[in-house]
């Protein structure tokens, strides 16, 4: 069993409270058989799709970059918005769209029910005061992937998942409850609360977190325990994933050290997996290079030194692939 010195944990800091931005739920009424173009401000290669799942209409945006040659299978990244945002805002904020148009991979932006995801923290029920989701979001995402794969040339060995805040919690739920589907996961500003499936097989994981995060504290979630559940922090989350992936080493090694961020983690893990934490020294809850359009005070500001967090995540996840291309159909 690995153990981490108390001195490592006590290096951490930060302040604050739980909150979520509120915006009107996304109104979508398109049919899967007839995908429509999104708003003219978007590239013409982004389309909106919907399907019925669990008696609800569930929708997503799909970016097929113009440089993609669909005669050959290409990777697919699932990118999930945070609580109170929607798929349109995530497409703008995360910047994975620009990366995909340079490097040639699909990006799917699913829409959470009531602008939220069921990321697996269910100690208290959803309410008007606490916007969250109690839907089968794992099942919805898998159905969305199956639909995309039926209509596009996706490399099933290179399906990745990312997200921000509540979407990062959902990323980690998918990683531990559908590890047979995803080659790697990397996300922003949230910890893992979902239960791990008995058939979990270690996959690479990276989390990006601002040291000054005022919503999901870097050091601990103790002030928000009624919402988030058992106490977590960025280092605890890293260590939890290292245990889960059977990583060797008593403390994380420093992989990259810069003036405004560092990357530390474990590289010797089961299944050739890795576990990484990217700490942004001057960032708050939004670690991206773009401001969040919802922009509640303090929540929407981008990381002030321009750390290319999305590029870091993509370069990490995209180096991994599954050894098997089995169908995701359950």
Across the structure, where does each feature detected by a protein language model lie?
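Hydrophobic alpha-helical segments
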Residues: 1-25
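A domain-start/cap signature at the N-terminus of enzymes
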Residues: 21-22, 26-76, 102, 106, ...
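Serine-hydrolase catalytic machinery in alpha/beta-hydrolase-like enzymes
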Residues: 51-61, 71-160, 164, 170-173, ...
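Alpha/beta-hydrolase-fold serine-hydrolase catalytic core, especially in secreted/extracellular enzymes
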Residues: 55, 203, 242-330
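Alpha/beta-hydrolase
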Residues: 78-80, 188, 280
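Active-site rim elements
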Residues: 127-132, 220-230, 296-304
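Short beta-strand/loop motif that positions the catalytic acidic residue
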Residues: 207-209, 213
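Acidic catalytic loop of the alpha/beta-hydrolase fold
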Residues: 213-216, 285-287
């Amino acid at each position: 069993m690995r153990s981490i010195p108390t001195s490592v944990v006590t290096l951490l800091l930060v302040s604050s409270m739980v909150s979520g931005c509120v915006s009107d739920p996304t109104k979508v009424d398109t049919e899967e058989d007839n995908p429509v173009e999104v708003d003219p401000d978007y590239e013409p290669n982004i389309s909106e799709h919907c399907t019925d799942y669990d008696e609800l209409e569930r929708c997503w945006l799909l970016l097929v970059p113009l440089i993609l040659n669909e005669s050959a299978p290409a990777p697919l990244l699932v990118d999930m918005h945070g609580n109170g945002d929607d798929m349109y805002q995530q497409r703008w904020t995360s910047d994975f769209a620009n990366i995909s148009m340079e490097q040639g991979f699909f990006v799917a932006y699913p829409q959470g029910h009531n602008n939220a995801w069921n990321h697996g923290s269910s100690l208290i029920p959803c309410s008007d005061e606490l916007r969250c989701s109690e839907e089968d979001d794992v099942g919805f995402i898998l159905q969305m992937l199956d639909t995309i794969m039926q209509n596009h040339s996706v490399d099933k060995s290179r399906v990745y998942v990312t997200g921000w805040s509540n979407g990062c919690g959902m990323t980690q739920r998918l990683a531990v409850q559908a590890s047979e589907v995803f080659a790697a996961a990397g996300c922003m500003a949230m910890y893992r609360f979902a239960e791990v499936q008995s058939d979990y097989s270690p996959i690479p994981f990276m989390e990006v977190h601002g040291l000054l995060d005022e919503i999901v504290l870097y050091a601990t979630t103790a002030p928000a325990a009624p919402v988030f559940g058992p106490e977590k922090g960025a280092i605890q989350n890293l260590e939890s994933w290292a245990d889960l992936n059977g990583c060797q080493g008593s403390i994380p090694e420093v992989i990259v050290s810069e003036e405004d961020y560092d990357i530390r983690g474990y590289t010797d893990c089961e299944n050739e997996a890795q576990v990484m934490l990217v700490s942004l020294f001057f960032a708050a809850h939004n670690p991206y290079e773009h401001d969040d359009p919802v922009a509640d005070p303090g929540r929407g500001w981008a990381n002030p030194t321009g750390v290319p967090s999305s590029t870091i995540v993509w370069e990490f996840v995209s180096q991994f692939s599954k050894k098997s291309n089995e169908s995701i159909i359950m």
